[in-house]
Swiss-Prot record:
LRR repeats lie at residues 525-548, 550-571, 573-594, 595-619, 638-662, 672-697, 752-777, 787-811, 813-832, 833-857, 859-882, 884-906, 907-931, 946-970. SUPFAM superfamilies: L domain-like (SSF52058), P-loop containing nucleoside triphosphate hydrolases (SSF52540), RNI-like (SSF52047). It comes from Solanum bulbocastanum (Wild potato). This is Disease resistance protein RGA2. Pfam families: LRR_8, LRR_R13L1-DRL21, NB-ARC, Rx_N, WH_DRP. The lineage of its organism: Eukaryota, Viridiplantae, Streptophyta, Embryophyta, Tracheophyta.
Length: 970
């Protein structure tokens, strides 16, 4: 890594020497000599990096060079910071503190120059060859959509495992566990994913859960993760182990589930026995699939013969390599093919090796570069279990300089951790790994670097959620990154401190990352770039925080702090301040606007924030502002957003404080093309402007057409803005509008071509249809298809709503999968919802029955929930038409007297029936005994059914005796 950071330092020195600040204190010659000395040393670094692998003295020399490099970087950084501060003062170079500062810098420069001369002299002992430094490989253009490559050579294995799982008939007490066993890099996780997503598996199991276990086999953590996976949401608050166990058993009880435990290392039999005891409540055929490298793990956990994964054939390895190295290139150099096949032989049939080697060579088309990989001495180094580590080391050594340290830095994240791309880029920036190129923003440079590492197969399992990109590293790739850091440790120059839930020290390439419970004296860490105190119990920052002149990244996520010290505003180099979910924080320091380098002010979830610091608009570097609380006074108003080029998402609150549309226009939202998510809210409990003014204000807050997510809360205007009827929302994917009681009609949302999720909560009692326009008379987009992309529709509390469309046509809601109806007593379903798979009807306090034809055209409905319909006495017989229905839940329907005899007989796919708190339900229908697919029946809080369903003697027992899992609760 030394050569990578030296290149960064040289670029910084070159840029600095061209500027005016270097002239301020008269150190131009000294900095020039430093630059020349580093250039001389840099010429031999590539050779040194390759030879250090089996040369301890050379490794020590590189460590000394590393330490000196970071020391020079500190001097340069401090010089620029102080020089900027002095130049902006009224005294300029005649500031009284200039002379002592010059003396201090001069002394440090002399000391580091002596060190570098000794290091330069020592390099002669190693007979290193000079090489021309390759600055950067040619970058290829990439799109924003990232897809996993095709899987080669594993179809046979997938089919065999699927058959084992589907044909498993063991009962719950003998829970089947199938381990997939194989060395690292063979593709165990990929194979498990193929099985998990196979259509046959999806149809066979009632529930599928995927858990990445890694090295921490903690029962409580795993049970919590399984519960969260099943429920699809995080558990709020802490729960003890016993209630967690009970909750999991309730969720799994009577279900034929598939649980995948990926990457298991636990060799403690008792730990597995404890977890297995909780899992033994499922239906016959419930299974656990594990992946592991360790035979002992397979023997401890497995009840079935471990499935040993073999190496890929040379042919499949070649196909995988070729797909990565050549892509869809039509003409391929036959000489490269010949060399490539020799390289693939060295990969030993390990997919990860073939994939990464192909990934690095896809940027190289010179035969010499391919021969260099084939003939590298790294192949001859001692190996552990396979040829994978030499292949991965080669992949690293082939990276351009600017990618090497960015990759190795990822070692600071725990193994198997889900990483956030945007956060990682901010951390790269904080450590100075990214340099601006032309007019490109640093964030865009970081995005390019990230994409290149992804294309070279260093990153995997890409997931995009809420506008953010998450990813993982294969554990062997993570091991490589960690080994690179460990080889370049410098304990004298700590640049990053993390607070985590465990206490130990991890060596990394440019410093050490320190993990601790109590905050140490910050003055000990003068070189600190990153301070990570996320989720800590600290409720106060010391005033010495202002002395960390190099600090770029401060993470206080989830801390209990109520305020921040004013000394924080002395941090001129601070780029990221993460205050997300600091729920007690009520204000920021008044001089926050002095943080001139601040790029990310993250405030999501800090709901106690009552105001913004004044003049936040002067932070012209600001790219991310999670929240903006509107104020009434100048310096606190919406106009502060006007000149900011914001990225990502922003939540604007207290819009009732905006006086008029003129003030709203000053926010200049229509020019912010890099915003993808916008939330706007009014507080209806304080002083309020007139409703007519609110319409004008919202009209003036028209966003840019690049927006993909829009949320509006508490709007009291009489109609929504005109820009909702327009192509302004042509890229919108999700809309949520809540508490807008005065709007008597809705915009034509059916026009929006990309809209996938529409949530309308607490609307006007005057609204009768979600869309009232005629199909052929609408603005914006010339299409007859209404809601062409909508997948989720969630409607709450529209007291007069009759239907979705006033005029129905054949082409409407073609892909609508999920629908939630709350407190809409008169709403009838459209006649054409062929794609609908999930329907929830809740809080209908009026209807005593549903329309007879209500469920007639829902041919693909799989999940139906009817809840809190207090006066509902019967269900329509059209229930029988739901041939695809797998789960039926009827909850808190206090007046329901019976289930339809004919309505249940047609449910030929039903596997789960749950009836809860239906006090008036007198008996179960005869048709239940004909439902041969039904495996789980749960009845709770139905007093009249308890005796009738008593095992063996109850009047209704014969109707349900064939069901494997029957649970009846008081």
């Amino acid at each position: 890594m030394a050569e990578a950071f030296i290149q960064v330092l040289l670029d910084n020195l070159t840029s600095f020497l061209k500027g005016e600040l270097v002239l301020l204190f008269g150190f131009q010659d000294e900095f020039q000599r430093l630059s020349s000395m580093f250039s001389t040393i840099q010429a031999v670094l590539e050779d040194a990096q390759e030879k250090q692998l089996n040369n301890k003295p050379l490794e020590n020399w590189l460590q000394k060079l590393n330490a000196a490099t970071y020391e020079v970087d500190d001097i340069l950084d401090e010089y620029k910071t102080k020089a900027t501060r002095f130049s902006q003062s009224e005294y300029g170079r005649y500031h009284p503190k200039v002379i002592p500062f010059r003396h201090k810098v001069g002394k440090r420069m002399d000391q580091v120059m002596k060190k570098l001369k000794a290091i330069a002299e020592e390099r002669k002992n190693f007979h290193l060859h000079e090489k021309i430094v390759e600055r950067q490989a040619v970058r290829r253009e990439t799109g924003s959509v990232l897809t996993e490559p095709q899987v080669y050579g594993r179809d046979k294995e997938k089919d065999e495992i699927v058959k084992i799982l589907i044909n498993n008939v063991s009962d719950a007490q003998h829970l089947s566990v199938l381990p997939i066993l194989g060395m690292g890099g063979l593709g165990k996780t990929t194979l498990a994913q193929m099985v998990f997503n196979d259509q046959r598996v999806t149809e066979h199991f009632h529930s599928k859960i995927w858990i990445c276990v890694s090295e921490d086999f903690d029962e409580k953590r795993l049970i919590k993760a399984i519960v969260e996976s099943i429920e699809g949401r995080p558990l709020l608050g802490e729960m003890d182990l016993a209630p967690l166990q009970k909750k999991l058993q309730e969720l799994l009880n009577g279900k034929r589930y598939l649980l995948v435990l990926d990457d298991v290392w636990n060799e403690d039999q008792q730990k597995w026995a404890n977890l297995r005891a909780v899992l033994k409540v499922g239906a016959s055929g419930a299974s656990v699939l594990t992946t592991t490298r360790l035979e002992k793990v397979g023997s401890i956990m497995g009840t079935l013969q471990p499935y040993e994964l073999s190496n890929l054939s040379q042919e499949d390895c070649w196909l995988l390599f070729m797909q990565r190295a050549f892509g869809h290139q039509e003409e391929i150099n036959p000489n490269l093919v010949a060399i490539g096949k020799e390289i693939v032989k060295k990969s030993g049939g390990v997919p990860l090796a073939a994939k990464t080697l192909g990934g690095i060579l896809c940027f190289k088309r010179e035969e010499r570069a391919w021969e260099h990989v084939r003939d590298s001495p790294i192949w001859n180094l001692p190996q552990d279990e396979s040829s994978i580590l030499p292949a991965l080391r080669l992949s690293y050594h082939q990276l351009p300089l600017d990618l090497k340290q960015c990759f190795a830095y990822c070692a600071v994240f725990p193994k198997d951790a889900k990483m956030e791309k945007e956060k990682l880029i901010s951390l790269w920036m904080a450590h100075g790994f990214l340099l601006s190129k032309g007019n490109m923003e640093l964030e865009d440079v970081g995005d390019e670097v990230w994409k290149e590492l992804y294309l070279r197969s260093f990153f995997q399992e890409i997931e995009v959620k809420d506008g953010k990109t998450y990813f993982k590293m294969h554990d062997l790739i993570h091991d490589l990154a960690t080994s690179l850091f460990s080889a370049n440790t410098s304990s004298s120059n700590i640049r990053e401190i993390n607070k985590h839930s465990y206490t130990h020290m991890m060596s990394i390439g440019f410093a050490e990352v320190v993990f601790f419970y109590t905050l140490p004296p910050l003055e000990k860490f003068i070189s600190l770039r990153v301070l990570n105190l996320g989720d800590s119990t600290f409720n106060k920052l010391p005033s010495s925080i202002g002395d960390l002149v190099h600090l770029r990244y401060l993470n206080l996520y989830g801390s209990g702090m109520r305020s921040l010290p004013k000394q924080l505003c002395k941090l001129q180099n601070l780029q990221t301040l993460d205050l997300q979910y600091c729920t007690k924080l009520c204000c920021l320091p008044k001089e926050t606007s002095k943080l001139g380098s601040l790029r990310n002010l993250l405030l999501d979830g800090s709901q106690s924030l009552t105001c913004m610091p004044p003049r936040i608009g002067s932070l012209t570097c600001l790219k991310t502002l999670g929240q903006f609380v509107v104020g009434r006074k100048k310096g606190y108003q919406l106009g502060e957003l006007g000149n900011l080029n914001l990225y990502g998402s922003i939540k604007i609150s207290h819009l009732e404080r905006v006086k008029n549309d003129k003030d709203a226009k000053e926010a200049n939202l229509s020019a912010k093309g890099n915003l993808h998510s916008l939330s706007m809210s009014w507080n209806n409990f304080g002083p309020h402007i007139y409703e007519s003014e609110e319409v004008k204000v919202l009209e003036a807050l028209k966003p840019h057409s690049n927006l993909t997510s829009l949320k509006i809360y508490g709007f009291r205007g009489i109609h929504l803005p005109e820009w909702m009827n327009h192509s302004v929302l042509k890229n919108i994917v999700s809309i949520l509008i809540s508490n807008f009681r005065n709007c008597s009609c809705l915009p034509p949302f059916g026009d929006l071509p990309c809209l996938e999720s529409l949530e309308l909560h607490w609307g006007s009692a005057d609204v009768e249809y979600v869309e009232e326009v005629d199909i052929d008379v609408h603005s914006g987009f010339p299409t007859r298809i209404r809601f062409p992309s909508l997948r989720k529709l969630d409607i709450w509390d529209f007291g007069s709503l009759k239907g979705l469309l006033k005029k129905e046509g054949e082409e409407q809601f073609p892909v609508l999968e999920e629908m939630i109806i709350h407190e809409c007593p008169f709403l009838t379903l459209s006649s054409n919802l062929r794609a609908l798979t999930s329907l929830r009807i809740c809080y209908n306090k009026v209807a005593t029955s549903f329309p007879e034809e209500m469920f007639k055209n829902l041919a693909n409905l799989k999940y139906l929930t009817i809840s809190r319909c207090n006066n509902l006495k019967e269900l329509p017989t059209s229930l029988a038409s739901l041939n695809a229905l797998k789960s039926l839940k009827i909850q808190l329907c206090c007046a329901l007297e019976s289930l339809p005899e004919e309505g249940l007989e047609g449910l030929s796919s039903l596997t789960e029936l749950f009836v809860e708190h239906c006090n008036m339900l007198k008996c179960l229908p005869e048709g239940l005994q004909h439902l041969t697919t039904l495996t789980s029946l749960k009845i709770r809080g139905c007093p009249q059914l308890i005796k009738r369903c008593e095992k063996g003697i109850g009047e209704d027992w014969h109707k349900i005796s064939h069901i494997p899992n029957v649970n009846i609760y008081i």
